[in-house]
Amino acid sequence: GIGQPSETLKNYASTLEEARADLVGLYYLMDTKLIDLGLITTLDVGKASYDGYIRNGMLTQLIRIDLGKKIQEEHMQNRQLVASWAIEKGSPENVIEKIVREGKVYYEINDYEKLRALFGDLLREIQRIKSEGDYQAGKELVETYGVNVDLDSHTQVLERTKPLDKAPYGGFVNPVFIPLLNDNGDITDIIIENNQSFVEQMMYYAKNYSTLD
């Protein structure tokens, strides 16, 4: 039998799993079934997500890396892998166009449906790699598309974002759901509170959930 991905794909397993997970979401974001289910009202939601994903994978996330360094973190490797692979494979039909305007690099998606098909192709290949434990193919995919950083783009990102004084990482503060119970102990309503700072929430999680397995 085939071993677990952590055994067969070794140090590339996490990056490939992150890519697989992202690709599932990206593929279905452009599915009209989401409109049928009432989850979105227009496929512009998917298009905006595609724009953001390519921009982040190729440019924005580079603010987190020192100039000249390679990408080592799995989530970041995954995002560049997906974006750069799609750009290369879609280049014959100009699916994603690299534009230099006034000396600044931009990426413009010219065909969202074809990009969706490319995401599906990559998802199929990564699923095959994981299912078959194809270490060599997984290694080549990650090392070719997810590790090395274009020096010119990296330099430009750091220069363009420096005046913004923007933190390289962002955090989330989640709402706290407080159930209201009747005399029988049944939940009758939920009160949503969102009055914690990020630090307060981390301390709250540590106090209340640190013993969970």
Range-by-range predicted roles:
Residues 3-6, 41, 156:
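Short, well-ordered helical secondary-structure segments
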Residues 97-213:
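Non-catalytic terminal regions of proteins
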Residues 26-129:
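Long, well-structured alpha-helical subdomains associated
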Residues 1-19:
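Post-HEXXH active-site segment of zinc metalloproteases
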Residues 14-31:
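An active-site-proximal "capping" alpha-helix that borders the catalytic cofactor pocket
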